[in-house]
Curated annotation (Swiss-Prot):
<keyword id="KW-0963">Cytoplasm</keyword>
<dbReference type="InterPro" id="IPR006195">
    <property type="entry name" value="aa-tRNA-synth_II"/>
</dbReference>
<dbReference type="GO" id="GO:0006427">
    <property type="term" value="P:histidyl-tRNA aminoacylation"/>
</dbReference>
<dbReference type="Pfam" id="PF03129">
    <property type="entry name" value="HGTP_anticodon"/>
</dbReference>
<dbReference type="InterPro" id="IPR036621">
    <property type="entry name" value="Anticodon-bd_dom_sf"/>
</dbReference>
<keyword id="KW-0648">Protein biosynthesis</keyword>
<dbReference type="InterPro" id="IPR004154">
    <property type="entry name" value="Anticodon-bd"/>
</dbReference>
<keyword id="KW-0547">Nucleotide-binding</keyword>
<dbReference type="GO" id="GO:0005524">
    <property type="term" value="F:ATP binding"/>
</dbReference>
<dbReference type="InterPro" id="IPR033656">
    <property type="entry name" value="HisRS_anticodon"/>
</dbReference>
<dbReference type="InterPro" id="IPR041715">
    <property type="entry name" value="HisRS-like_core"/>
</dbReference>
<protein>
    <recommendedName>
        <fullName>Histidine--tRNA ligase</fullName>
        <ecNumber>6.1.1.21</ecNumber>
    </recommendedName>
</protein>
<dbReference type="InterPro" id="IPR045864">
    <property type="entry name" value="aa-tRNA-synth_II/BPL/LPL"/>
</dbReference>
<dbReference type="GO" id="GO:0004821">
    <property type="term" value="F:histidine-tRNA ligase activity"/>
</dbReference>
<keyword id="KW-0067">ATP-binding</keyword>
<keyword id="KW-0030">Aminoacyl-tRNA synthetase</keyword>
<dbReference type="Pfam" id="PF13393">
    <property type="entry name" value="tRNA-synt_His"/>
</dbReference>
Length: 426
């Protein structure tokens, strides 16, 4: 026997039992964003490597360590997309969606990062993202956050997630803060780890995101970003908070929240849960007013978020909030005799047409009646619909209950349709 080929490490199969959960999650996401007036956009999995270097930032873990990058046959460097925002901006610029226009867009699909695989974090993962363009005021920041709050309510997990907010201010305010932060960190070089020392000059705000407890200890007395915010950014953030307060959305202001990507400015936010063991981010986003221009378009305000679907599915399963999953088949259609076998798919088509949402699986592969009923039982169907030559001649079918202790019944086809409709709607 030939050696089996295994899936690539960190890239997982999604099997039939799990895909039903994913489909339910995806449907809720689609329905919710559609109710807010957002439109779907789809774009390639492979992009120019330069797109991510220019947008995410060259001195970031994603670009330095995690991207899947390769040269094609022309020698061009290409990358499997590690995130969606930069790709959405590229697609918007290239296709004329953003120039002097407002857009509300969403996307969903696989992303790729070469990280150490662990529960809820994989090398191929699925992301749901939402981006808005052309609106500079805080009301759109609030809408994006309120939309996420609506998602948690739809999933039934509102009590298990919490919102953290911060403002990074304007580029000028951030530059002033960077200078103050670097000056402070230079007084504590003996405490900083090598990673923090490297980031201190290339991207000092990322030091605030350090997981090293010694570094976190010295950051307690570090200069605060809020002390360096420009007046306009302060007003923008206050307006956002006022809108969230009015809507009853609870939040905590976390001045160390900076996000891991270089393109953010002003509003940044994360939705966090403690229900997956260690604290975990379920959804994160913010404002990135400079990115469209940075990638070759006209200066355009923008705000959005992304959420990892693997982690969301894990959270829903941990909290038992997935709800009822529709069974694979409601009816297993068994047949006895060649004539009945030929008529079986025709009768199945009639049932599917006349009984909305009815799922009918037709037996295939031959076998005696006992074997067919055994297959019916394994199919998870509620009933077996049985046809033989006698049933064909009389224009009837026999219904055998598979999950209830009820006597089987023989009915005319129209009566059977009514019974099956009642069965799946009860």
């Amino acid at each position: 026997m030939a050696k089996q080929i295994q899936a690539v490490r960190g890239m997982n199969d999604c099997l039939p039992g799990d895909t039903q959960v994913w489909q339910k999650v995806e449907n809720i996401l689609r329905e919710t964003v559609a109710s807010f007036g957002y439109q779907e956009i789809r774009f390639p999995i492979v992009e120019s490597t330069d797109l991510f270097k220019r947008s995410i930032g060259e001195v970031t873990d994603i670009v330095e360590k995690e991207m899947y990058t390769f040269a094609d046959r022309n020698g061009d460097l290409l990358t499997l997309r590690p995130e969606g925002t930069a790709v959405c901006v590229r697609a918007g610029n290239e296709n004329g969606l953003l120039y002097n226009q407002e857009q509300r867009l969403w996307y969903m699909g696989p992303m790729f990062r070469h990280e150490r695989p662990q529960k809820g974090r994989y090398r191929q993962f699925h992301q749901f993202g939402l981006e808005t363009f052309g609106i500079a005021s805080a009301d759109i920041d609030a809408e994006v956050i309120l939309l996420t709050a609506q998602l948690w309510e739809s999933f039934g997990i509102s009590e298990h997630v919490r919102l953290e907010l911060n403002s990074l201010g304007s580029n000028e305010a951030r530059a002033n803060y960077r200078d103050a932060l670097v000056a402070y960190l230079e007084q504590h070089l003996d405490v900083l780890d090598e990673d923090s020392k490297r980031r201190m000059y290339s991207n000092p705000l990322r030091v605030l995101d350090s997981k090293n407890p010694d570094v976190q200890a010295i950051l307690i007395n570090a200069p605060k970003l809020s002390e360096h915010l420009d007046t306009e950014s302060k007003e923008h953030f206050a307006n956002l908070c006022e809108r969230l307060d009015a809507a009853g959305v609870k939040y905590t202001i976390n001045e160390k929240l900076v996000r891991g990507l270089d393109y953010y400015n002003r509003t940044v936010f994360e939705w966090i849960t403690d229900s997956l063991g260690a604290q975990g981010t379920v959804c994160a986003g913010g404002r990135y007013d400079g990115l469209v221009e940075q990638l070759g378009g006209k200066a355009t305000p923008a705000v959005g978020f992304a959420m990892g679907l693997e982690r969301l599915v894990l959270l829903l399963q941990a909290l038992e909030c997935v709800g009822d999953i529709r069974r694979n088949a409601d009816v297993y259609l068994a047949s006895m005799g060649d004539k009945a076998s030929i008529q079986a798919p025709i009768i199945a088509a009639t049932l599917r047409r006349d009984v909305p949402n009815l799922r009918v699986m037709v037996h295939a592969g031959g076998g005696n009646f006992k074997k067919q009923l055994k297959r019916a039982d394994k199919s998870d169907a509620l009933v077996a619909v049985i046809i033989g030559e006698d049933e064909l001649e009389q224009g009837v079918v026999t219904i055998k209950y598979l999950r209830e202790r009820k006597e089987q019944v023989t009915l005319e086809l129209e009566q059977a349709k009514a019974l099956l409709a009642e069965l799946i709607n009860s």
